[in-house]
Amino acid sequence: RKKLNWNYEPFQIPKKMLNEWRKIGVKAHEKSKKFKNKNHSSINLTKNLKLLNTSIKKIKNDYFKNLKPLATRKTSEMFLNVASKLPNLIGGSADLAGSNNTKTKNHKIIKPGDFSGNYIHYGVREHAMCGVMNGIALHSNLIPYGGTFLIFSDYCKPSIRLAAMMKQRVIYIFTHDSIGLGEDGPTHQPIEQLTSLRSIPNLYVFRPADLIETFECWDIAIKSKDTPSVIALTRQGINPVRRKISYKNKSERGGYEILRTKDKIDITIISSGSETSLACEICHKLATENIYSKVISMPCQELFDQQNKIYKNKILSETELVVSIEASETHYWKKYTGASGLNFGVNDFGKSAPYKKIYDHFGLNTDTIVQKIKEKL
C-alpha cells in the first residue's frame, strides 16, 4: 500500500475512481435496457403449453389404443416431436443425438451465419454443452435442453451444480440410464450417478417409467422456472405401467400409488423408471401366494420429499415392510425403506451381456425378489 501510495481504508473507493465508474454505468444503461428487452421479450409460454397439451392428448389417446413396450428415450422423442414447436425450447446433444433421441424432424440446426434454428450440435463436449446451456438460460427466456448418456453426467456436474445454485431452468436428457443398456458393459453402465445427482440441492432428478410419466416429467421440467431438471431415460423397451388414460399429472407429487392388490396390504414396493414394471409383476406374483402389496412409482424423489407429512405417511407408513427396486446404487432409497426394509439394486460395477442376463446376475427379476421378500416376512 505504501509503495503504491494507496492511503485509503479497506473498501473505500477514491471519489475520482468512483465518478469514472459511474459514468460507465450511465453510458451502458440504455444499451443494457435494450439488451434486456430484446432477450427477455415475453413469449406466452402458458398459451403455447395449452396448444402443446392438445397435441399431447392426441398422442396419449393413440398410445392407449395400442399399448406396447417402448424405451423412454423414444417416448421422450415423441414428446419433443410436438414440444420442439415451442418457440423458446432450444435442444442439443453432445454428438449423441441419434442415441439420445433429442433431435426430431421439426428441429432446425443452429450454425455459423444462421442462428434462427432451435438445435445445437455441441460435439463430444458434455462440460462445454452444459456451460453453454447455463449461459443461454441466464441471458434469455429460452429453455435449453441437452443430451448425453447418464454415465457421462460426471462431465457435466460442475455446470449442473451451478445451474441449481443460480436457479436456472436447464434440462438434461441422460439416456442409457442403467445396466439395461447391455453389452457396452461396466464403463458405460451408470451405478452411482443417480445418487450423486440426487444429492445436489435444487435439482429435480426424474426417472419416468413409461410414456405417460415421461410426458409428465417433461411438463414439470419446462414449467420449473427456478430449478434445473435431469430426465434419466432407458435404452431398452419397457412395459407401460399406466394403463388407464388420465390427464392429471400424477408425477407432480414425486411418488404415487400405481397398483394395489388388496385393501389391507403387507408390503409397500417403491420403484422408478424401468423397474416399475418389474415391481408390478412382483406385486401380482405375491398376490397369487396371498401376500398383498402396493406399488409406488417414484419418478422424482425431490418432489416427493416436498410433499406434506400426511401424504408421505400415507405412501410410506401403511406397512411395516417397505421395499425399493432400482437398477442403480441403493443407499439413497434407505431414507424410505428404513433399516428394516429391503433394497434391490446394483451396488457393484455392471457386466457386458444382454441386459436381461445382467438383470438376472444382479437378482433383479421377479422370482428372486419374491423369494427374498417371502424370506423377510
Which residues does each predicted region cover?
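Charge-dense, low-complexity intrinsically disordered segments
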Residues: K15, N19, N66-L70, D360
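Intrinsically disordered, low-complexity N-terminal regions enriched in serine/proline/glycine
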Residues: N7, E20, K34, N39, ...
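Thiamine diphosphate
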Residues: R1-Q12, K16, E30-A232, G237, K314-I315, T366, ...
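Terminal amphipathic helices with adjacent charged low-complexity linkers/tails
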Residues: R1-N53
